[in-house]
Swiss-Prot record:
Keywords assigned by UniProt, alphabetized: Cell cycle, Cell division, Chaperone, Cytoplasm, Isomerase, Rotamase
Entry's family note: Belongs to the FKBP-type PPIase family. Tig subfamily.
Organism: Clostridium botulinum (strain Okra / Type B1)
Role this protein plays: Involved in protein export. Acts as a chaperone by maintaining the newly synthesized protein in an open conformation. Functions as a peptidyl-prolyl cis-trans isomerase.
Principal location listed in the UniProt entry: cytoplasm
Entry comment, domain topic: Consists of 3 domains; the N-terminus binds the ribosome, the middle domain has PPIase activity, while the C-terminus has intrinsic chaperone activity on its own.
Protein name stated in the entry: Trigger factor
UniProt-listed PANTHER family: TRIGGER FACTOR CHAPERONE AND PEPTIDYL-PROLYL CIS/TRANS ISOMERASE, TRIGGER FACTOR-LIKE PROTEIN TIG, CHLOROPLASTIC
Annotated Gene Ontology cellular component terms: cytoplasm
Length: 430
């Protein structure tokens, strides 16, 4: 094998790879073995015609497609390894010369990992991030717990008031016609919750059980459905029942019922401690992000478009998986958000570029600082991931993960070490 390397443009190289005729003929024979059964030549049973007859009957090029694939699969990886080329995408293969008894020559044009020029990455100055737990936040959490533990009972008499729960039947019309999703029976709605569009809920205030009313509202301009966006609608509503929420008193008895604590003060203290921990973790994450951004601002990288496009595709796949867990798909998501695949991808572009840049910088710093993942760290990370799967044989699962996802685990570990290095060497300023 002979390889010539030509720099076409920044981050793009073209390799001209020559495979000697003997090797190519071996690939043709391999192609023949793979495809022999599909050839039907008069005078021979199907799949039994010899190679020389196949070439005469179908032409010598009939076996070239697979032969080319065999040659490329064998020689391309060796060529990029020998020439220290790090591709970020599949190569564009073009045949230069091919034929019986000839050397096989092809070119492989490929986009490569860009050069990263690191600026200052130790000692970057970043503003201190800190949060305080407000008493109001603690009180709001208590109110939320109070709401969750409210007792609900039927309101035998009287009208609907703010805070009541109305059980309703409704049917909606737009342009005088019923529309999909605009009808329900025995629907529970808390008046004042803002669940329904416009002032729908406010128009139910004052109604009694078994009363009906025509409610007029307008859908928001960005409602998410083209047939409803910005359109006025009329709903026929009937009150089936009215319920009242009775909030429990915020006292020691409440604390005993909803927690492991004996007094309300102990519960408040626990809520405050949990909030402090959450805010501390939030501050830490924001500070780390600010450090990485500062390091990124000092670096110079010309990122190939293909790397950004690949990251966008990864982000779309992640979105698709998250939606799947919620019983949705991308089509439904686009309709609900009044968006499209193109709009979502464009929205993701800035984040994708930021992620790619960060990854490249982290990898370069790891190389400069000689930061690597040890075998012990890989085992620990694999075990950590395995525990999340909830399998009985955690050790076996960890072993499988360590083998199948080693590259991803290494990146995760190394990036974590690089982040620690950057944070430890940063300067926190007020």
């Amino acid at each position: 094998m002979n390889v010539k390397v030509e720099n076409i443009e920044k981050n793009v190289v073209k390799l001209e790879i020559t495979v000697d005729s003997e090797k190519f003929n071996e690939a043709v024979k391999k192609s023949f073995k793979k495809n022999a059964k599909r050839f039907n030549v008069p005078g021979f049973r199907k799949g039994k015609a010899p190679l020389n007859i196949i070439k005469k009957y179908y032409g010598e090029g009939v076996l070239f497609e697979d032969a080319i694939n065999f040659c490329c699969e064998d020689t391309y990886p060796k060529a990029i390894e020998e020439n220290n080329i790090k591709p970020v995408d599949y190569p564009q293969i073009d045949v230069v010369q091919i034929g019986e008894g000839k050397d096989f020559i092809y070119t492989a044009e490929v986009t490569t990992v860009p050069e990263v020029k690191l600026g200052e990455y130790k000692g970057v100055e970043v503003k201190k991030v800190s949060y305080e737990v407000e008493d109001e936040a603690v009180e709001n959490e208590l109110k939320s717990m109070q709401e969750k533990n409210a007792r609900v009972s039927l309101k035998e008499e009287g009208e609907i008031e703010k805070g009541n729960i109305a059980i309703i039947d409704f049917k909606g019309y737009v342009d005088g016609k019923a529309f999909e999703g605009g009808e329900a029976k025995d629907y529970e709605i808390e008046i004042g919750s803002g669940t329904f569009i416009g002032d729908f809920e406010d128009q139910l205030v004052g109604l009694k059980k078994d009363e009906s009313k025509e409610v007029n509202v307008s859908f928001p301009e960005e409602y998410g459905r083209e047939d409803l966006n910005g359109k006025p609608a009329t709903f026929e509503v009937t009150i089936k029942d009215i319920k009242v929420k009775e909030l429990p008193a915020l006292d020691d008895e409440f604390a005993k019922e909803v927690s492991e604590f004996d007094t309300l003060e102990e519960l408040k203290s626990d809520i405050k401690d949990r909030m402090k921990k959450e805010l501390s973790e939030k501050a830490k994450a924001e500070y780390e992000e600010a450090v990485v951004e500062a390091v990124g601002a000092n670096a110079e990288i010309e990122i190939p478009k293909v790397m950004i496009e690949k990251e966008i595709e990864n982000m779309v796949r992640d979105l698709e998986m998250r939606l799947k867990y919620q019983g949705l798909d991308l089509k439904s998501y686009y309709e609900f958000t009044n968006s499209s695949e193109e709009k979502v991808k464009e929205y993701m572009r800035e984040t994708a570029e930021k992620r790619v840049k960060t990854d490249l910088i982290m990898q370069e710093i790891a190389k400069v600082e000689d930061i690597k993942a040890t075998e012990e760290e890989l085992k620990e990370k694999a075990m950590e991931v395995a525990k999340q799967y909830g399998q009985k044989d955690v050790e076996k699962t960890a072993e499988l993960i360590a083998n199948a996802q080693k590259a991803y685990l290494e990146i995760d570990i190394v990036n974590g070490k690089v982040l620690d290095l950057l944070v430890e060497n940063s300067k926190e300023i007020a």
